[in-house]
Amino acid sequence: MATVPTALAGRHFLKELDFTEEEFRGLIELAAELKAAKRAGTETRYLQGRNIALIFEKTSTRTRCAFEVAAADQGASTTYLDPAGSQIGHKESVKDTARVLGRMFDGIEYRGDSQTKVEELAAFAGVPVYNGLTDDWHPTQMLADVLTMTEHSDRPLREITFAYLGDARFNMGNSYLVTGALLGMDVRIVAPKSYWPAQEVVDRAHRLAAASGARITLTEDVAEGVRGAGFVVTDVWVSMGEPKEVWAERIKALAPYAVTMDVLRATGNPDVRFLHCLPAFHDLGTKVGQEIFEAHGLDSLEVTDEVFESAHSVVFDEAENRLHTIKAVLVATLA
């Protein structure tokens, strides 16, 4: 039977900044226990009779599946609302939607552009609200990534070094920087300066680091940024919903920050691991990949296929861990 942290009962999960280091670590530990129980066939169903609404204004594979399977494993039911299936923000205000769904459901997940929208849902729903991704933060992904790091390193979190390469201005860059700072890790943001997180986010990270002992580096130098790293991380250069017109500019700016085998060798760590939240443009196996090849002559973007398919890559362990960590959030807040 897992040890459920009662301090998180009834809490929202909106961004990493809302949690203490102890609370965040507690969710990682709970996820590891739930994962082990699922594999052993000894999982306890803590959420029998619960109902969870899943609002997706942005499409998803991993996040939707993780919430649905996590809920089902725990005995809860889910209702999926896509943009065509709900009136949120169109015919009905976020505030009113929150108050309606809060009367019917025990928890609400939201995935879309606006952090303001998920915060407003939380303010008026009266039940726990979960951020499945916004433009600013991706907290459920951070739980999965940190769990994956603990599984693939024999070091404690405070001794783990990871480097994030690429566009760090939005949710993934913000979340990696703040999460690493919160947990006392050695976190490096490696990108052109114009692609660094906003100064407000950097300042918040430095304040967290002062308390946790984290080491924070922001650099344009790839060799400096990855030296000694145990994990190299990246994300897509063009985010969901962005127009194709931005591709050329992004590719020109970020091409030196693509994760190649040379980048992994530059860590000096033969056991370095590669993480990516997915989907990844590492080959020509997608429609978007084909369009990029036709327009720019590139067979990969943020990571080469050689790295993606190598023994260094743990991206599918990371993807699986979305399930176990989201389950931990549901159990901790609703059990």
From Swiss-Prot:
The yes or no answer to whether the keyword Nucleotide-binding is present is: no
Q: Which residues bind L-ornithine?
A: N171, D235, S239, M240
List, in alphabetical order, the Gene Ontology terms for molecular function in this entry: amino acid binding; ornithine carbamoyltransferase activity
Pfam families associated with the record: OTCace, OTCace_N
Q: What is its EC number?
A: 2.1.3.3
GO CC term (a single one):
cytoplasm
Where is the protein found, in the record's own terms?
Cytoplasm
Pathway annotation from the record: Amino-acid biosynthesis; L-arginine biosynthesis; L-arginine from L-ornithine and carbamoyl phosphate: step 1/3
**What InterPro entries does this protein's entry cite?**
Asp/Orn_carbamoyltranf_P-bd (IPR006132), Asp/Orn_carbamoylTrfase (IPR006130), Asp/Orn_carbamoylTrfase_sf (IPR036901), Asp_carbamoyltransf_Asp/Orn-bd (IPR006131), Orn/put_carbamltrans (IPR002292), OTCase_ArgI (IPR024904)
Gene Ontology biological process terms, A to Z:
arginine biosynthetic process via ornithine; citrulline biosynthetic process; L-arginine biosynthetic process
The UniProt catalytic activity note for this protein reads:
carbamoyl phosphate + L-ornithine = L-citrulline + phosphate + H(+)
Any idea which UniProt keywords this protein has? Amino-acid biosynthesis, Arginine biosynthesis, Cytoplasm, Transferase
User: Which residues make up the binding site for carbamoyl phosphate?
Assistant: S60, T61, R62, T63, Q87, R111, H138, P139, T140, Q141, C277, L278, R322
Question: Main role?
Answer: Reversibly catalyzes the transfer of the carbamoyl group from carbamoyl phosphate (CP) to the N(epsilon) atom of ornithine (ORN) to produce L-citrulline.
Record-linked HAMAP family: OTCase
The family annotation for this protein states: Belongs to the aspartate/ornithine carbamoyltransferase superfamily. OTCase family.
- NCBIfam families, A to Z: orni_carb_tr, PRK00779.1
Name of the protein in its database record: Ornithine carbamoyltransferase
